[in-house]
Amino acid sequence: MEGVDNTNPMLTLEEGENNNPFSSLDDKTLMMMAPSLIFSGDVGPSSSSCTPAGYHLSAQLENFRGGGGEMGGLVSNNSNNSDHNKNCNKGKGKRTLAMQRIAFHTRSDDDVLDDGYRWRKYGQKSVKNNAHPRSYYRCTYHTCNVKKQVQRLAKDPNVVVTTYEGVHNHPCEKLMETLSPLLRQLQFLSRVSDL
């Protein structure tokens, strides 16, 4: 697709139980998402509002959503939508925090990208109008209930869409694996210097 920088991962933020980023936007819309959206800050549960407190998006997202520019109509701003507010408050007594979803679009030949965490595949589903199935994974850390979905786009099979649901409550395991040889070496050197 011309005019789209495919080198940067694209980001979609959604929140809620039944929000599925694959069903809400078609493939053309997903490919046209602004690659320059900036994500920064802590990803934490929001206690009092529907908007996740830890998300900070650049002013480009506001222009993108607000209708300014040629792509303004692709993502609707649901903050003033009464249905969104009803769904947000629905079940508030039952469940205090909504699962947060983050979707990354990446060009890759591999379906599963190494993100530093360990995952266990627990399912696979064929997707309507797509020759590539969607795979479902869970984080293997015993107290973490983060899930991810991995799927290729129907119109561009080189693009892998990885959707994370939830927030990890533990450090990145690959980081610890990388640091452990260094820590062992430091312990060995400290023992040698004590002699």
From Swiss-Prot:
Q: What's a single GO CC term here?
A: nucleus
Q: Which SUPFAM superfamilies match?
A: WRKY DNA-binding domain
Q: From the UniProt annotation, which stretches of this protein bind DNA?
A: 108-173
Q: Which domain of life is it from?
A: Eukaryota
The principal location of this protein is nucleus
| Positions of region (Disordered) | 1-20, 70-93
- Which PROSITE patterns does the UniProt entry name for this protein? WRKY
Q: Which keywords, in A-to-Z order, does the entry hold?
A: DNA-binding, Nucleus, Transcription, Transcription regulation
UniProt GO MF annotations: DNA-binding transcription factor activity; sequence-specific DNA binding
**Bias-annotated ranges (Polar residues):** 1-10
Keyword DNA damage belongs to the record: no
For this protein, the record's Pfam families field holds: WRKY
Question: Could you tell me where this protein is found in the cell?
Answer: Nucleus
PANTHER family documented for this protein: WRKY TRANSCRIPTION FACTOR 56-RELATED (PTHR31221:SF208), WRKY TRANSCRIPTION FACTOR PROTEIN 1-RELATED (PTHR31221)
Function of the molecule: Transcription factor. Interacts specifically with the W box (5'-(T)TGAC[CT]-3'), a frequently occurring elicitor-responsive cis-acting element.
**Similarity comment text for this entry:** Belongs to the WRKY group II-c family.
In its UniProt entry, what is this protein called? Probable WRKY transcription factor 56
Q: Which organism is it from?
A: Arabidopsis thaliana (Mouse-ear cress)
Source organism phylogeny: Eukaryota, Viridiplantae, Streptophyta, Embryophyta, Tracheophyta
**What gene makes this protein?**
WRKY56
